[in-house]
Amino acid sequence: MFDSDKNSILQSDFCQRLVVHSLLLVFLVILLCTSLYPSSAFIVGLLSSTCAAIGTYEMSSMVRMKFPFSFTRYSSIGSAIFVALTCLTARCKMLLPEHVDLIPWFFLFFWTVHLVFKSRHYKLGPIGSTGLALFCMLYVSVPIRLFLHILYGFVHTDTPFIGIWWAIFLIATTKSSDIFGYFFGKAFGKKRIAPVISPNKTVVGFVAGCIASILVSLIFYSHLPKSFANQIAMPWILVALGIILGISGFFGDIIESTFKRDAQIKNSSDLESIGGMLDVLDSLLLSTPIVYAILLITQNGTFLG
């Protein structure tokens, strides 16, 4: 009786998560495929800024549960503007003066200086308040910035859509690891990897997630467009990336679980079937910098990081 109830709950929860995440992925793929057009680029910038603002707000809210932190709103606004400027400079880099990509960093610097003066009379003081605010902003907004650079890093080449291909590859491999790791871990997992930090993470789920990301990377490798083949140095690296992204996505999830455990909460927010923005982004926050670094190393001279 209890096993039957457990299985039905598991199936219902998994189906709900699968449907919601699948719809989100379909929407993202459609948006990314058209992201080189001005109207879609504007939507990409708006969506990225919104994700950065919400994610930073959730991270700041967790900090607030541990410390008398007063910069939740300012951190969110700072992240949103930082990402919006990044999207603008990344998409229009070829049309703007050299070193224009430094503009978001200049903004972040002066925003931090503004917070230093604003925090003089707060309990944590300038060092504590500004340090925590800067961490919350960087933890969420920098990976999103790197994702935008991956997306628009090939706009100067004869095949500008290769950035879209890499962005979809990154999301597909990482999120497939998330979904399959969750399902197989729930259904068959017994031995826990980190019972104190994240009791739901099991060895079976971890292995299943890595296998899923490898399979997805193999699909991308086998269907690599001929027009892209010459632009991708060392195509076999896609298979290796499947393993790396499966592992990095897992640890990205573990890192966020560590923050949530410290703040004594289950989800970063209360969105149905999602949890929170950080619960959606957690694995990508670690896997995105890895793909960005790989592109810098292997696509030297082609990728504008």
UniProtKB/Swiss-Prot annotation:
Keywords: Cell membrane, Lipid biosynthesis, Lipid metabolism, Membrane, Nucleotidyltransferase, Phospholipid biosynthesis, Phospholipid metabolism, Transferase, Transmembrane, Transmembrane helix
Domain of life: Bacteria
Transmembrane residue ranges: 24-44, 97-117, 124-144, 151-171, 202-222, 232-252, 277-297
Location in the cell: Cell membrane
Catalytic activity: a 1,2-diacyl-sn-glycero-3-phosphate + CTP + H(+) = a CDP-1,2-diacyl-sn-glycerol + diphosphate
Pathway membership, UniProt: Phospholipid metabolism; CDP-diacylglycerol biosynthesis; CDP-diacylglycerol from sn-glycerol 3-phosphate: step 3/3
Keyword rRNA-binding: no
GO biological process, one term: CDP-diacylglycerol biosynthetic process
Assigned GO CC terms: plasma membrane
EC number, UniProt record: 2.7.7.41
GO molecular function: phosphatidate cytidylyltransferase activity
S-S pairs: none
Bilayer topology: Multi-pass membrane protein
Pfam families: CTP_transf_1 (PF01148)
Family, similarity comment: Belongs to the CDS family.
Protein name in UniProt: Phosphatidate cytidylyltransferase
Organism field: Chlamydia muridarum (strain MoPn / Nigg)
